[in-house]
Amino acid sequence: MITTSVRVSRPGFQRWAARAGVAGPVLFTAGFLVQEAVRREDYSRVADPISALEADPRGWIQQVNFLVFAVLLTIFAIGLHRGIATTRYGWAGPALLGVAAVGLILAAVFPLREDPAGEPYDPGHHVIAGVTFFSCSALALVVLSCRFAADPRWRGLARYVGIAGILGLGCFVVLGRFAMPGGAPLHEVAGLLQRMTLLVVTFPALVAIALRLRRLACRPSALTRS
């Protein structure tokens, strides 16, 4: 018989962490959608990445959007770690979410800028932010799926989260290899592919995990045997 211990934590903090896990993707999405609506004439949702919003004179708004998401994702990662049964190397999934949050901070600290022709460009280091966020968020889902599989309370989400993580890694490769670089075959639809990665793959998985954490936070911690 295998005994799996569930970390005893403050349910109040876990509830707040779960709210942060839902609010992060939702507020971030609302933030860039509103900015896109304002910049309707000189911004393309299909071609331009979300980070191109930083190149605008009002780019500080998107920088703040990145930072707020980073804070909420970090809080969520901490609460999530405390809400899943402890396993060997189980810390890796939440830690990868934390690294993804660092990628968001880098995106704010090293924003895209506009050249004289009005085109956004990376003056340096912003590409590291994108690589960090998209790779680590996808890897986090894959690793978390393994930890979920070891916890009966989370097992029902394991397959979905694992598939989302694998799809996220595939999207990361497509974006980095075939869409984001100038002259790449899918460069003209890079913005669309980036948004699909977030809104169809990564964000729904994060919200599903956060909602499960919120539900479990209302239950008393216990020792689960399987």
Each language-model region and where it sits:
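N-terminal compositionally biased, intrinsically disordered segments and leader/signal-like regions
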Residues: T4-S5, R225
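Hydrophobic, aromatic-enriched alpha-helical segments typical of multi-pass transmembrane helices
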Residues: I2, V8-C218
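Short, highly charged, low-complexity non-transmembrane loops/tails of multi-pass membrane proteins
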Residues: C218-S226
